[in-house]
């Protein structure tokens, strides 16, 4: 497809989405010159604004002013994306294959894709909570539309190491230690031994092993570990912080290593404590230090009802009032946010630790619009809407009198994804300032997490950082989305390497290195997080324990995990690696020259794959696309464990979908596969996905009526229209198909 045609098609996908469907039946109320869905207006006007002391008329008028003032600039930024993409397409068509490095870089600078690096300077962020600034630890990402998931994640600040080990393949199912319906004491002993080995590694005793300890108690204001008739102390005397219970017989002992807390829980009457000579029933680890409540890639929020549900959950998390009725077996209980944890400090005073994860909220990017609010019959940009509403809903989370407040520093943390270069980051900075003024919040109350997941941001990362130097809270690599943009940006250059080979392509490691180097050089350590991406294989925790520690050794002080259990296991890595020391070493070594490698386009050196290899790539990606899309479109599930073609559960969201659809669109564009082969694979894989979902009573089969399956048609569009979709994003097609399905089935 010629470059200008791709650009026009991209605009058409977006503009069609902005104009409200004539069949729209949403009940609306006019406020602030906007037509707002009544369900959203009522929630904000009746539930939120009175609680936060904001006048409703002033709020809605100011809301409308921000939308009208900032919409033209938002449109300009999207038009600039299309303009640059058209120029890139033309360049690749004239220079197919891997570009000449010097000429390519010069071209990118000429068209403004690459900008000059800003002068040496560091970020100036203030009032950052310690969980972000000075604590290294795991980060969860959870869909905000699911209250149970949100509560589980918020409460995942503390997690049972014993449960995490026993319930996963972190302890191999072998040698009599297999998992089963009943408790396996052989497995239990392996868990206990793992825990003792861990304590010896990260909190060693001076002259003894934790495995030999017969009793723990407190003497002379210190932890006493009794072995035979001797008393042994921790090598690090400062590691002991406090206890609960009595000096002689504590019920818990609080320790600290690398800034993270460890709680030894003691109960000789407990089934596990009975088997342990010290009465130790569990080792509780500080786990998910921070959590991102997600309105973006892990949710399917396509209309006012969906958005209002998410906003309500976010509001109640900030008030501390979110609850959920949970059924387990024949009993039902109410899940709520955990209280803070209270100990007796080693000085005898009360010591209180935060009981919940520190929460970020991820807004959507600059591309999408949403029918929850209209202006002159057109949907407003969802990113502007998110910025205003997630902020006003977060105000209770900074209220000093709130016992379950989120931030003790008075900051609201917003992750902004899918930004292309410093101009777009500057737009976010301006938007946040407008929101602060609307809500009478001090300047830079809103902190921003900048996702480094688009190519134009990666190659201009320093400039992006400095555009938000007064409000930056993190930078984070998102390899999955970043790969999707890598493919789409250079779609016309030629056929790309296979999806799995992207992991070892030169640009990938250079991209990861550059993120850390830029963060360190711009002064993030001690002020903001430098993060890395998700471990997607939810059931392979043993493999995660072995491999994910590598992200810390590369300089990340946080990395994403798919579950509270994953957070607890990943937390052990931060005890074994002092990340801030690693960052000091990287700073001393000097910044690596990464730009040339980042610009290395992953065009395949040759395309002589065998028919079997092509079929494997087709089937793997088609199965992945269908397995995710069918739940997104027909069940409104934006993030879930999706079995791959080998029945291995993978945590899938829109980022993984973007890669799978873009690689096939690329191969189709360059004749590696044909449209007929794509359709044939989709139809075969639909049968596989149907079988994988056979146990779900709410599931609708895609086969054999493929033309009637909305999900199948969505998957087909994602591939066949993949070159047209702006930046390879899947949202325009997914949103349209989800709304179609809801309309067909009368779902609100």
Swiss-Prot record:
Cofactor(s) this protein requires: Mg(2+)
Binding sites annotated in the UniProt record for acetyl-CoA: 141, 148-149, 298, 335, 562
Gene this chain is encoded by: glcB
Subcellular location: Cytoplasm
Protein residues bound to glyoxylate: 362, 453, 478-481
Family per record: Belongs to the malate synthase family. GlcB subfamily.
Name of the protein: Malate synthase G
Organism of derivation: Corynebacterium efficiens (strain DSM 44549 / YS-314 / AJ 12310 / JCM 11189 / NBRC 100395)
GO cellular component terms, semicolon-separated: cytosol
Subunit structure: Monomer.
InterPro entries reported for this sequence: Malate_synth_C_sf, Malate_synth_sf, Malate_synthase_TIM, Malate_synthG, MS_C, MS_N, MS_N_TIM-barrel_dom, MSG_insertion
Free-text function comment from the UniProt entry: Involved in the glycolate utilization. Catalyzes the condensation and subsequent hydrolysis of acetyl-coenzyme A (acetyl-CoA) and glyoxylate to form malate and CoA.
Reactions performed catalytically: glyoxylate + acetyl-CoA + H2O = (S)-malate + CoA + H(+)
Gene3D superfamilies: Malate synthase, domain 3, Malate synthase, domain III
Any coiled-coil regions, as ranges: none
GO molecular function: magnesium ion binding; malate synthase activity
């Amino acid at each position: 497809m010629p470059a200008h045609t791709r650009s026009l098609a991209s605009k058409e996908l977006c503009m069609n989405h902005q104009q409200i469907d004539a069949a729209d039946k949403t009940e609306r109320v006019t406020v602030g010159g906007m037509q707002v869905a009544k369900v959203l207006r009522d929630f904000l006007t009746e539930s939120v604004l009175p609680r936060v002391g904001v006048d409703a008329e002033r709020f809605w008028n100011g809301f409308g002013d921000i939308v009208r003032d900032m919409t033209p600039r938002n449109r300009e930024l999207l038009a600039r994306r299309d303009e640059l993409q058209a120029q890139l397409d033309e360049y690749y068509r004239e220079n197919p294959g891997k570009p000449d490095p010097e000429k390519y870089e010069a071209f990118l600078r000429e068209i403004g894709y690459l900008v000059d690096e800003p002068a040496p300077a560091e970020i100036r962020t203030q009032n950052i909570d310690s969980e972000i600034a000075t604590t290294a630890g795991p980060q969860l990402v959870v869909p905000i539309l699911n209250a149970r998931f949100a509560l589980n994640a918020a409460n995942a600040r503390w997690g049972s190491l014993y449960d995490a080990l026993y319930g996963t393949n972190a302890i191999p199912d072998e040698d009599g230690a297999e998992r089963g319906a009943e408790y396996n004491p052989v497995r239990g002993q392996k868990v206990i031994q793992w825990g003792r080995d861990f304590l010896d590694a990260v909190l060693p005793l001076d002259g003894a092993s934790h495995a030999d300890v017969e009793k723990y108690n407190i003497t002379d204001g210190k932890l006493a570990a009794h072995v035979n008739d001797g008393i042994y102390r921790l090598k690090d005397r400062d590691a002991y912080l406090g206890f609960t219970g009595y000096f002689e017989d504590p019920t818990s002992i609080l320790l600290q290593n690398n800034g993270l807390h460890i709680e030894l829980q003691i109960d000789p009457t407990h089934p596990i404590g009975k088997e342990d000579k010290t009465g130790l029933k569990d080792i509780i680890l500080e786990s998910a230090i921070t959590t991102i409540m997600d309105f973006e890639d892990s949710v399917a929020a396509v209309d006012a009802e969906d958005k209002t549900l998410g906003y309500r959950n976010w509001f109640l998390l900030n008030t501390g009032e979110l609850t959920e009725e949970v059924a387990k077996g024949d009993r039902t209980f109410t899940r709520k946010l955990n209280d803070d944890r209270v100990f007796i400090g080693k000085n005898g005073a009360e010591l209180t630790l935060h009981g919940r994860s520190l929460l970020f909220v991820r807004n959507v990017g600059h591309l999408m619009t949403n029918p929850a609010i209209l202006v002159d019959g057109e949907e407003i940009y969802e990113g502007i809407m998110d910025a205003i509403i997630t902020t006003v809903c977060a105000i209770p989370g900074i209220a000093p009198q709130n016992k379950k407040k989120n931030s003790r520093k008075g900051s609201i943390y917003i992750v902004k994804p899918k930004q292309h270069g410093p101009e777009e980051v500057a737009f976010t900075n301006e938007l946040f300032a407008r929101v602060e003024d609307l809500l009478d919040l001090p300047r830079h109350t809103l902190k921003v997490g900048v996702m480094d997941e688009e190519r134009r941001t990666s190659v201009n990362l320093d400039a992006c950082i400095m555009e938000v130097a007064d409000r930056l809270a993190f930078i984070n690599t998102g390899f999955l989305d970043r790969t999707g943009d890598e493919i789409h940006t250079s779609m016309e250059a030629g056929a790309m390497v296979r999806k799995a080979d992207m992991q070892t392509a030169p640009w990938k490691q250079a991209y990861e290195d550059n993120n850390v180097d830029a963060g360190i050089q711009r002064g993030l350590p001690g002020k903001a997080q430098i993060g890395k991406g998700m471990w997607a294989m939810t059931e392979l925790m043993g493999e995660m324990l072995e491999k994910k520690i590598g992200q810390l050794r590369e300089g990340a002080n946080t990395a994403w995990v798919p579950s509270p259990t994953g957070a607890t296991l990943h937390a052990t890595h931060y005890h074994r690696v002092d990340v801030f020391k690693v960052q000091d070493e990287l700073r001393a070594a000097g910044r690596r020259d990464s730009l040339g490698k980042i610009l290395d386009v992953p065009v395949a050196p040759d395309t002589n794959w065998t028919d079997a290899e092509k079929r494997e790539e087709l089937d793997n990606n088609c199965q992945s696309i269908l397995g995710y899309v069918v739940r997104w479109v027909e069940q409104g599930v934006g993030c879930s464990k999706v079995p791959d073609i080998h029945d291995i559960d993978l945590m899938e969201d829109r980022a993984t979908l973007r890669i799978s659809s873009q690689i096939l669109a690329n191969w189709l564009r360059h004749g590696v596969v044909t449209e007929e082969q794509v359709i044939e694979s989709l139809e075969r894989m639909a049968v596989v996905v149907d079988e994988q979902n056979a146990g779900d009573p709410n599931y609708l089969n895609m086969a054999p009526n493929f033309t009637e399956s909305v999900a199948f048609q969505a998957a087909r569009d994602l591939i066949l229209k993949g070159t047209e979709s702006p930046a390879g994003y899947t949202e325009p097609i997914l949103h349209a198909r989800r709304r179609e399905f809801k309309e067909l089935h009368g779902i609100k």
